[in-house]
Amino acid sequence: MTIVNLAAYHFVSLDANEQWRPLVTARCNELGLRGTILLAPEGINLFIAGTREATDAFIAYIRHDPLFEGKFATLQFKESLSDSQPFRRMLVRLKREIITMKKPAIKPELGRAPFVDARTLKAWLDRGHDDAGRPVVMLDTRNAFEVDVGTFDNALDYRIDKFSEFPEVIDANRADLEGKTVVSFCTGGIRCEKAAIHMKEIGIDNVYQLEGGILKYFEEVGGAHYHGDCFVFDYRTALNPQLQPTENVTCFACRAVVTPEAQQSPSYVPGKSCPACAQAASAA
């Protein structure tokens, strides 16, 4: 059976999340969906999967049900397919932020961050500069272990371990960004949008987010100016520029990404250990 995987987020002011939670949970269970939906005062973030019929019904529900007062009417979804269900259960969770930066919540009514679409970005990277002639800096806002699976060519990578470290890292390295066009990017768009807003707030000019993140870029233009795959937070571990699962796996013990080459190591025991585990043990 083909399973449809949906990902979406939207920054919008929400104040009825506690009332919505049981109703959204019930509807998802009725449809046989699995995954996670996060609701916070600053918006919604979701990763769900199910049959085509179920996911189509969910999209209609979240966009048009009177319960939501039109707040999700323009919610855009990124879609991929898999042969099996990547999630074990259905969760609707209430959070302070839909992506944790430990900064005051975004004020959606003030407008979203400036963005650049995939085709325009590719044209900039082909030329080596943006439409105004400024050099383009690609800024990876993901965690270090995600970056190691794949990233844009010559991207800035500050080796953060969690997104809440981003503001401090940017404060310490803003000289790298001054006088350039900065394009922040992440898997699906949520971290790079929040990152772009933060950079604008602290006075860094010419900042954009990559619309839809890496996955939308793959969908629109493939893997141009990108090397490797894109880490995803489900059983597939990583997707290639054709949005197909790769042979990378996640170590059950330490959650490290194990490449096909690393799977040949004697230290790799499926479900038990990997070379990263062995390295950590030897360093202890």
UniProtKB/Swiss-Prot annotation:
Gene3D superfamilies: 3.30.70.100, Rhodanese-like domain (3.40.250.10). SMART domains: RHOD. InterPro entries: Rhodanese-like_dom, Rhodanese-like_dom_sf, TrhO, TRHO_N. The active site is at 186 (cysteine persulfide intermediate). Signal peptide: none annotated. It comes from Burkholderia orbicola (strain MC0-3). GO terms for biological process: tRNA modification. Catalyzes oxygen-dependent 5-hydroxyuridine (ho5U) modification at position 34 in tRNAs. The gene is trhO. Coiled coil: none annotated. Residues 132-226 form the Rhodanese domain. This is tRNA uridine(34) hydroxylase. Its EC number is 1.14.-.-. It is an enzyme of class 1 (oxidoreductase). It catalyses: uridine(34) in tRNA + AH2 + O2 = 5-hydroxyuridine(34) in tRNA + A + H2O. PANTHER family: RHODANESE-LIKE DOMAIN-CONTAINING PROTEIN 7-RELATED, THIOSULFATE SULFURTRANSFERASE/RHODANESE-LIKE DOMAIN-CONTAINING PROTEIN 2. CDD domains: RHOD_YceA. Keywords: Oxidoreductase, tRNA processing. GO terms for molecular function: oxidoreductase activity, acting on paired donors, with incorporation or reduction of molecular oxygen. Belongs to the TrhO family. PROSITE patterns: RHODANESE_3. It holds the Pfam family UPF0176_N.
